[in-house]
Amino acid sequence: MAQRAVWLISHEPGTPLCGTVRFSRRYPTVEKRARVFNGASYVPVPEDGPFLKALLFELRLLDDDKDFVESRDSCSRINKTSIYGLLIGGEELWPVVAFLKNDMIYACVPLVEQTLSPRPPLISVSGVSQGFEFLFGIQDFLYSGQKNDSELNTKLSQLPDLLLQACPFGTLLDANLQNSLDNTNFASVTQPQKQPAWKTGTYKGKPQVSISITEKVKSMQYDKQGIADTWQVVGTVTCKCDLEGIMPNVTISLSLPTNGSPLQDILVHPCVTSLDSAILTSSSIDAMDDSAFSGPYKFPFTPPLESFNLCFYTSQVPVPPILGFYQMKEEEVQLRITINLKLHESVKNNFEFCEAHIPFYNRGPITHLEYKTSFGQLEVFREKSLLIWIIGQKFPKSMEISLSGTVTFGAKSHEKQPFDPICTGETAYLKLHFRILDYTLTGCYADQHSVQVFASGKPKISAHRKLISSDYYIWNSKAPAPVTYGSLLL
């Protein structure tokens, strides 16, 4: 007997969605068991958004739901059990235990330890009765002695820690959550909260939550047989929470699109109060497969006053955003260069800036340059022996650009000319610098509507994301080059 997931949803008629997910918890270990038990009839637990829409439709709680629906409203579908099948993405999620009480919908998905086709009788699914007991226990806890919305918010903020004791790994141990509350020594909601020693003050003003996702992509490209190109994405999620109260609670969910790359090696700030085990165990050392946890990644936390890094992560994206080759050959007193760059079709073609820096170390100043470029502009810094290819804000429709030419140098001055111990002879590189706003290579984003804030006032929530190049090198394929490996990119 176990539960795959549990939700608390406030019914809000007149709002665009007619409801808000106030709390949700998934149990990845139980989900893996469901995949094994159910076999070909397995239907995964959906994200909060699709579940909310499907449940409100099935319960006839949508404002615009006035038409007769045969599959739901016919006489053959009269429901007296509070157990439903939700049609989500063309598949039916069953059984879903759900009921409405005091404008709050309580719902859970019990584990069925057998195939779902044909559908087994309810009396044989022991998790259903446990699900009712679980939800009634949560209801009793939320509304026992509850007088106003602030007390309800406080109790909702305590649920993540309470369920760690009352329902670890989806298995209900004690439906009386008050027992777990006493065991964890929570302060009673009637007692004033104490100012924590690490929080030097409290915020007063308009509530707002700002979320910023920054991904940096590193790459070493060689265009050589026997030497593999390497690339790595490192992400940082930064938050600034201006919220009134001594101990406000916030839950932020990071989501991925269907074809997104799973997040790995996740490190979180100490203010994060709890995490699903699947988030902590996802590692870049493990081989990627279809069973890799792909979110949503939920981070409940009590924010400090200042801006802070909520978490760091890595990801193994299938291809680098820009592929290229660089060829440089010395011909008598000049260098002949050929460069080709191609933007991958899946990458957003809208840069804040994009440049290729082409340095020539251990040589004299540039005295003569002849070149031909298919796109962009070339700037010459003669004394620095540097070319900067300004690509601009977009690649052409072909997604491919090229630059070729010859460079002649004057006499070398050891005091002024750039020196590098690695780039000797024909060993050379070009380095890409670019930034793309409102985009991440993994597809990771923070859904503003899924942010849960347990504090007074309705905060303004903003979310931003960007992709930045970092140590993005393309080496001369006609000469030796230093070799790195994926594990060393960090």
UniProtKB/Swiss-Prot annotation:
One of its GO terms (biological process) is vesicle-mediated transport. It comes from the Eukaryota. Keywords: Cytoplasm, Endosome, Lysosome, Membrane, Protein transport, Transport. Residues 206-476 form the MHD domain. One of its GO terms (cellular component) is lysosomal membrane. The keyword Lipid metabolism does not apply. Pfam families: Adap_comp_sub. Signal peptide: none annotated. Expressed in various tumor cell lines including Jurkat, Hep-G2 and HeLa. InterPro entries: AP2_Mu_C_sf (IPR036168), AP5M1 (IPR039591), MHD (IPR028565). Belongs to the adaptor complexes medium subunit family. Probably part of the adaptor protein complex 5 (AP-5) a tetramer composed of AP5B1, AP5M1, AP5S1 and AP5Z1. As part of AP-5, a probable fifth adaptor protein complex it may be involved in endosomal transport. According to PubMed:18395520, it may play a role in cell death. This is AP-5 complex subunit mu-1. It comes from Homo sapiens (Human). The gene is AP5M1.
